[in-house]
Amino acid sequence: MKGVDEAGAEKQTPEQQETPVLRPRKPRPAKPASKGVVRFLPLVLLTLVIAALAVPMGLGVAPGFFGPSLFGVAGTPAPKVPPWQQVPKQLSRTQIVAPLDASAPVPLPADVTNQLNALLTPDGGGDFTGVVEDALTGLPLYDRDGAKNRVPASNMKLLTAVAALRAIGPETRFSTRVLAGPSASTIILSAGGDVLLGDGPSQPSGVLGHAGLETLASDAAKALQDRGVKGPVTVQLDDGLFTGPALNPAWSPDDVAAGETAPIFPIALNSARTSPGATTGPRPQDAALTAAEAFAGKLQAAGASAGFTVVPGVERASAPAGKQDVLASVVSATVREQVDLMLQTSDNYLAEVFGRMAALSAGKQGSNDGATAAVSAQVAELGIATDFMHLADVSGLALGNQVSARQFADVVRAITSGPDTRLRAALAGFPVAGLTGTLGDRYGDASTSQGAGLVRAKTGTLNSVIALSGYVVDTNGRLLVFSFIGNGLTPGAAGNKVALDRSATALASCGCTGG
């Protein structure tokens, strides 16, 4: 079985992989607070950097928030608010690392427990488990059945992110290539794991559409013209990188029909969506062939000026073994950037592709079984016990997944402050409460607004499952990691999501040092 390098991924050296590069993102306008609600947001939010040696913890600004002082009546200064919790006026492009104080007081477990037990209650049936840990020391601050296996929903993507960053590498890019075929007028579109292709020109500043089929077709047409090919040109597709069933039998047919996922292939347009802006609705059931046919259409258009035509239709074939003649290629955004997108949008299709690419990088089969084995192995290599963990998929759609809140808290701790600095690349992907991703429309009422901008966490939702795992800096400047998971819940009960958000908010606003 070909490894990821042979599949066309451009892989970096270990030294390159272990030195993450922070890139500023385009600033977003600050979101207005709900009427009558004052939000306390951090000075620095959008990238948290934990230095491995000299500075145990730090908050990176890339970009960050700058906020004014808060004043009470008649100009009287209000109680002092830590700088990371001040109200923002705008996003800043500044890039610095502001270290957190490693001597900041650790919350008292009894105080944390008292607060969370009052908040973490189900709305109707079911129950919650939860774990809170001090990120620097690993000290447990809260544990409600933390070792109990749970259906985690999309919190599973945290494990997949770890596996992708470790096994594939943060700076790796996936290559989609056009190869010379068995005859001069036959070409082969070779899939290399990029499922975020766009159908237009490549967009170097983008993640979705970073590599474009129009650019690939234009470059391929020029190469064919330079070789004197007159056509008609036959397009074949080699998508044999992945093996096993493309559709996981553990997934509900209703979820597949609704477009929550689709059969998994190593090439797709728009993460197997019908258009770049689509986030719901049915997906193509053969994303690889859909992408190949779109490429053939672009090649037909490019060939008109290059003096050749394209045979209608695309058939599957295998690329020739040995040295391959590459006519053209385009590369994806980096794995770190794709992980960011996966976590922010909770992209099931991209998560499943990452699992298979991680498996190939580890010398396993690019299948669902290979993916689940690779993800479990990478988590175990972090020193996290996986004896009772069971993975049925790597996106979190399967009800057969069994992972504990403690395992998720430990994974978040590994990302924020563990020794493997490659995992820091996942930090920017955690949605920010009230601002970005799947938390963008939450934390807007009076009971959760003080967590807005402070809580960064991966969400997870299935019919009777809800989960939230992430990190937060409390009022004393202590970095905490947490995981809350509810199972057997009453479907549609609004109070369950609120219970999670209030619990995370309590951590953000809790000094909890007994003073």
PLM feature spans:
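Beta-lactamase-like hydrolase cores
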Residues: P79-K148, S218-G228
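Active-site SXXK
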Residues: G138, P152-P170, I267, A294-F295, ...
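Small-residue-rich helix-loop
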Residues: D143, L360-G515
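Short, well-structured active-site flanking segments
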Residues: A167-P182, A306-V314, L423-A426
